[in-house]
Regions:
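Extracellular/luminal Protease-associated
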Residues: 1-29, 109, 218-221
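Structural recognition of the beta-strand scaffold that forms the well-ordered cores
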Residues: 1-4, 29-33, 76-80, 93-97, ...
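Active-site-adjacent substrate-binding region
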Residues: 72, 174, 181-301, 305-306, ...
């Protein structure tokens, strides 16, 4: 199989190669060819002028060694900055994550992200800041792909980390800050992408952030929900509220992404510095909270909107189905009201307007994360 990417990816240069996860039989030789080389071979074999003689085949030399092997080990690399609350029996954590497997140089995707987790932790240590919660830093393997005989072959390292290697993180990690391609501005406006439940907290957090114009002229916003592109999705479905710096909408995905042109020549220092500062500040803000700031009403509102859209699109549905829809919408509205009241209580505790003992807080935090997990299920 010879793959030539004509558009959509690797558009930066005719010499660009593009690599993606394999979806095909393991015995089939497969490789990527640049548009430039493909055009040359096509002209040799199929000249535009039919009067020009051409060979029936062309001999080429391929110098490559790349094998897909089953059941090979991969390694997630984890470190910890202990929190002061651990000595009091509070084992809650905040997670910083990025993947270290990459195609070609993988400068933006995702080596800059791994180094940013180091930079954030170094800043905390150098400043003398002592976190309340233990900070876990995880460099993840097998994000690009890693499962044979499956359509769901990417973000494998993250899934294994939270479901198999450290399932006890579920109920303990109050937030995951995941990073992807963080040293490049993918749009004129930056965005933190999160699960529905964290969006309100993040919007209030962003109100106090000054965004440098040289990095993002149109400022900063919050998007929800997360997408399946990156490891924050695998982590979120385990019951850990997750965020990622938004990266999927910009032209970089069509030009440099997964090609040999994702290298240090395409680097924006102002963007990288801002992301260091933004997510360090977010980490410290989360570290000072008593409870995970989860507003479940956002998820139910999205559900209500989805049900209404389905109802509008299926006017020919059976009568018994249509009759049940109003009751369902009413039930969702009542749940939203309860979720609003719960979030108000969470905010009161986090703003220290009401006090709560540690055993009560710890149990409530665990229950909130349990509800979050059920929402993902």
């Amino acid at each position: 199989l010879i793959a030539v990417q004509t558009q959509g990816y690797a558009e930066i240069d005719p010499r660009a190669l593009n690599a993606q996860d394999i979806a095909g039989p393991e015995y089939a030789p497969a490789f990527s060819l640049s548009r430039q080389d493909a055009s040359y071979l096509k002209e040799l074999l199929c000249p535009e002028d039919p009067a020009v003689s051409h060979p029936s085949s062309v001999a080429v030399e391929l110098n490559a060694s790349s094998w897909v092997e089953r059941n090979r080990p991969a390694y997630n690399i984890t470190g910890y900055l202990p929190g002061t609350a651990a000595s009091e029996g509070d084992d809650r954590m905040i997670l910083l994550s990025a993947h270290y497997d990459s195609y070609f140089d993988g400068f933006q995707d995702d080596n800059c992200a791994v180094s940013m987790t180091f930079g954030i932790i170094k800043a905390l240590i150098d400043s003398g800041y002592q976190p309340r919660y233990t900070i876990a830093v995880c460099a993840l393997a097998a994000e690009e792909w890693g499962v044979c005989d499956s359509k769901f072959d990417w973000s494998t390292g993250a899934w294994n980390q939270v479901f198999r290697v450290h399932p006890e993180w579920q109920g303990r990690v109050i937030a995951d800050l995941n990073f992807e391609l963080p040293a490049h501005a993918h749009n004129t406006q930056d965005a933190i992408r999160s699960t529905y439940e964290s969006a309100d907290f993040l919007k209030h957090f962003c109100e106090n952030i000054t965004v440098p114009k040289e990095a993002y002229p149109d400022g900063l916003t919050v998007l929800a929900p997360i997408e399946t592109w990156s490891d924050d999705f695998s982590i979120a479905i385990s019951g850990i509220p997750s965020t990622v710096n938004d990266f999927s909408a910009g032209p970089f995905m069509e030009t440099h992404y997964h090609s040999q042109y994702d290298n240090e020549e395409f680097y924006q220092e102002a963007v990288y510095r801002f992301h260091h500062e933004l997510y360090t500040r977010l980490l410290v803000t989360l570290d000072q909270l008593t409870l995970p700031p989860l507003d479940f009403s956002r998820h139910f509102l999205a559900m209500k909107s989805s049900v209404a859209d389905c109802l509008a699109a299926q006017s020919n549905a059976p009568a018994e189905v249509l009759e049940e829809i109003p009751a369902l919408l009413e039930s969702i509205s009542k749940v939203c009201e309860s979720a609003d009241l719960l979030y108000e209580k969470i905010q009161e505790i986090n703003n220290h307007t009401v006090s709560a003992d540690f055993p009560i807080v710890s149990g409530l935090s665990s229950k909130l994360l349990h509800i979050f997990r059920k929402m993902q299920d």
